[in-house]
Amino acid sequence: MTVDLLLGLQWGDEGKGKIVDVLTSNYDIIARFQGGPNAGHTLEFDGIKHVLRTIPSGIFHKDSVNIIGNGVVIDPVVFQKEIEGLEKFNLDIKKKLIISRKAHLILPTHRLLDAASEASKGKAKIGSTLKGIGPTYMDKTGRNGLRVGDIELEDFKERYRSLADKHEAMIAFYDVNIQYNLAELEKEFFEAIEELKKLDFIDSEEYMHQAQKAGKSILCEGAQGSLLDVDFGTYPFVTSSNTTAAGACTGLGIAPNKIKEVYGIFKAYVTRVGSGPFPTELFDEVGATMARVGNEFGSVTGRQRRCGWLDLVALKYAVQVNGVTQLMMMKGDVLSGFETLKVCTEYNYKGQNISHFPYNIEPENVTPVYKEFKGWKQDLTGLTTYDQLPVELKEYIEFIEKEIEVPIKIVSVGPDRKQTITK
């Protein structure tokens, strides 16, 4: 029996989907434990790019069972479109995908609430993806939400109507101009609900417990990144769920002492989408080059990601919070061609150098302290072994390992699953 955990250590978009895809053959079960369709996991193989939003990244492997856990929020409409997008691969979705009855549903009015709330904030917007994630988690913690298991109840539509009416009153309270046709949105929603009913719903915590007793190997898949965690991220510019290791326990019903390996995924540089502090952000041609070469555009929103140098203060913090046992560095190939690379090793925080991640990292409080490294010119995308990597990249990797005190086991040198070097 093995229960391992894979999660992102930055502000999301680290490349988790690719690594899950690479590792899936080692596991019987891939289980998503938090987030919703605001996250996009990008996989690329055979020259074709695939973006998954809610479905776990093991769906393309014939022998794996994929679980959507109780910590996930599901938009039935988006979910149906995601399944339709997989039909061309002739996958047995009903056999390969099962859903926790305790996962919460995103209603059309959740999305409208999200838009109304964001519009009302003016310049103080937090950069919401407007997918209804925040309002759904608010209903969950406020004990008002609807769950997947409620679909099976005879009075589901009455429960829906009661909650949707509350939402409409809240939307009116915001007093912003949002145009919508709720009747049309609800028609689409209930059609998607009927499709959702065709899948198997489970009591996921019992399923996971029995799987562990049977000796099954399980990989828990996180969405977004640790610095977006509602408790440990750069609040309020965060998501509404726990993206850290603790979220796997509450989002799947797995006991903490059952988790063995914690795989931490990070980019060789840093990106962020939307608003929020970003100490190492670059506003020059270097940052623009990173975005262009790295194709740094959100897989869900399409928004260009902000780019910056690797931040070891933030990375060390994420490693500590998650108890990471192995690191995996993504997009090493994007840094090819830069004369000089920089790594933030400390923050100058209110005039004093510190090496820990403080409560407030707004620009007026934090200035990054950098160590410079010599860059490399070599194209990495065709390399297959660690020994083939340029010496400058090896020095970069070894410095990170020394500072973080966790080994880097995988270096990604391209988007395809084959462009993955094991160290």
From Swiss-Prot:
Pathway: Purine metabolism; AMP biosynthesis via de novo pathway; AMP from IMP: step 1/2. IMP binds at D13, E14, G15, K16, N38, A39, G40, H41, T129, R143, Q224, T239, R303. The keyword Methyltransferase does not apply. The active site is at D13 (proton acceptor), H41 (proton donor). GO terms for biological process: 'de novo' AMP biosynthetic process; IMP metabolic process. Pfam families: Adenylsucc_synt. GO terms for cellular component: cytoplasm. Plays an important role in the de novo pathway of purine nucleotide biosynthesis. Catalyzes the first committed step in the biosynthesis of AMP from IMP. Belongs to the adenylosuccinate synthetase family. This is Adenylosuccinate synthetase. The lineage of its organism: Bacteria, Pseudomonadati, Bacteroidota, Flavobacteriia, Flavobacteriales. The gene is purA.
